[in-house]
Amino acid sequence: MSTSDGVPSTGGRSPEELASQVRLLEDEVSDLRRRLTESPGGSRGLELRLADAQRSLAGVTSQNERLAQTLREARDQIMKLKEEVDRLAQPPAGFGTFLARNDDDSIDVFTGGRKLRVNVSPSVDLDTLQRGQEVMLNEALNVVAALEFEEVGEVVMFKELLADGDRALVIANADEERVVRLAEPLRGDTIRAGDSLLLDSRAGYVYEKVPKSEVEELVLEEVPDIAYESIGGLAGQIEQIRDAVELPYLHPELFKEHQLKPPKGVLLYGPPGCGKTLIAKAVANSLAKKVAAKTGQEGKSYFLNIKGPELLNKYVGETERHIRLVFQRAREKASGGTPVIVFFDEMDSLFRTRGSGVSSDVENTIVPQLLSEIDGVEALENVLVIGASNREDMIDPAILRPGRLDVKIKIERPDAESARDIFSKYLTTTLPLHADDLSEFGGDRDACVGGMIRATVERMYTETEENRFLEVTYANGDKEVLYFKDFNSGAMIQNIVDRAKKMAIKDFLDHDQHGLRVSHLLQACVDEFKENEDLPNTTNPDDWARISGKKGERIVFIRTLITGKQGTEPGRSIDTVANTGQYL
């Protein structure tokens, strides 16, 4: 405040008061300045103490967390140990087989040789339980869990299904017949007579079909991928079998119009190694392709390769049962119009003339079984029986009569023309040929291969001194010289080519001579002939000759005319025996 003339007013206070007030203010300012000066140092100390406190807190917190984690782990370990103790202290659980469900939601089970009615835990869904299913029982014999079906047991043979459809008659060991229940997996499934089933003999349930390897191996083999074009030297025989097999399937309306029934069977007979089995396999393959071409759908046929010795069984009736099973499966597959070929290899070993057995008369029941299958009460539609044998004279005549094996085709040993055809299947222009042999034909691979084949066939089929093999003496005293060409076969030709290829490989490795030569083939012929020197070594020349395809007058004596493999061993004679009627 000021006066009117501009002089400051003192507010009625004296100068001493004002001076005192000024001093107080100055002291306050000084104190503030001092405190301001000291303030940064104090703040720093507080910050340090605060940081120390925070570090201590963090350490205590971490220690507390570790302690809490240790306590939790200890608690979990204690709980696990307690559970283990409780588990080990529990009484053992039992197992049973579910039989039926009752109206009060209890169930009947079979356990420990007893049939019991027990209660079920709420955790088990009654609607999912199936007949024959395994269940778990607690100490109070209450069901606490549902398990799978039994997987082990006794193998029995199915005979027939009973009228109620829930039970079956089976044959156990020692031909014991039993009535058993069908478990749920078998209900509604197709079960055929002769099928093997898995039986739980305690509960009386059969659970599943068990494939029997000795039967399954013989049944339903897919068609081999062998075409007629792969077979050489048998054009006439192939034409015969195509007429007998393919025409009825490709033109059934013509057969029906002419009231002609297709043949039921074909017999392929002839010496070993001449292509009987090969033709049978090609029949199935060709038939499938022809059916596919006619219908426009994927062609399929089945080739059941039945090896005679595999069917034989020491137990009475087992061989006949296997034959029935084979034809039963064949009928099932053929019922849909699919052609099925049942091929009996080495037919003479299984269906020998009845009464010709020396140690047993097993053929007395096996032969009638086959006859009843071929033309019995059940029709054999779309099923063709093909038999192969090199001793057709030993097959029972009832099998060979018309109406059973209608078509009989002889697979002869190849002549020179057929041998050239067979060689052409194995000697092709894709093989590596020696440069010297190629140069003789101006580099023409086709001409070179043709020349090799001609030279090899000429070496095999000429009636020269070095090609003489045997001198046979007949029962009437006549003698005849047989050459190697009389014992040639497609298998021998293949073996000769394989020998020549091996020689070519060895020449390349030893002498760096690359490619097949005609000299390899000629040397392979010599080695093959020498190796066959020991083949007629038998105590029964007549039977050996029949197997080899030499029919006619009975042979009583054989003498080899070739030298040994080293070229120094003289020819030798082979004695005969008095009884020449027994088959070796």
Swiss-Prot record:
Keywords: ATP-binding, Chaperone, Coiled coil, Nucleotide-binding, Proteasome. Belongs to the AAA ATPase family. The gene is arc. ATP binds at residues 273-278. Homohexamer. Assembles into a hexameric ring structure that caps the 20S proteasome core. Strongly interacts with the prokaryotic ubiquitin-like protein Pup through a hydrophobic interface; the interacting region of ARC lies in its N-terminal coiled-coil domain. There is one Pup binding site per ARC hexamer ring. Upon ATP-binding, the C-terminus of ARC interacts with the alpha-rings of the proteasome core, possibly by binding to the intersubunit pockets. ATPase which is responsible for recognizing, binding, unfolding and translocation of pupylated proteins into the bacterial 20S proteasome core particle. May be essential for opening the gate of the 20S proteasome via an interaction with its C-terminus, thereby allowing substrate entry and access to the site of proteolysis. Thus, the C-termini of the proteasomal ATPase may function like a 'key in a lock' to induce gate opening and therefore regulate proteolysis. Residues 583-584 are annotated as: Docks into pockets in the proteasome alpha-ring. GO terms for molecular function: ATP binding; ATP hydrolysis activity. One of its GO terms (cellular component) is proteasome complex. Pathway: Protein degradation; proteasomal Pup-dependent pathway. It comes from the Bacteria. GO terms for biological process: modification-dependent protein catabolic process; proteasomal protein catabolic process. Residues 16-91 form a coiled coil. This is Proteasome-associated ATPase. It comes from Nocardioides sp. (strain ATCC BAA-499 / JS614). Pfam families: AAA, Prot_ATP_ID_OB_C, Prot_ATP_ID_OB_N. SUPFAM superfamilies: P-loop containing nucleoside triphosphate hydrolases. Consists of three main regions, an N-terminal coiled-coil domain that binds to protein Pup and functions as a docking station, an interdomain involved in ARC hexamerization, and a C-terminal ATPase domain of the AAA type.
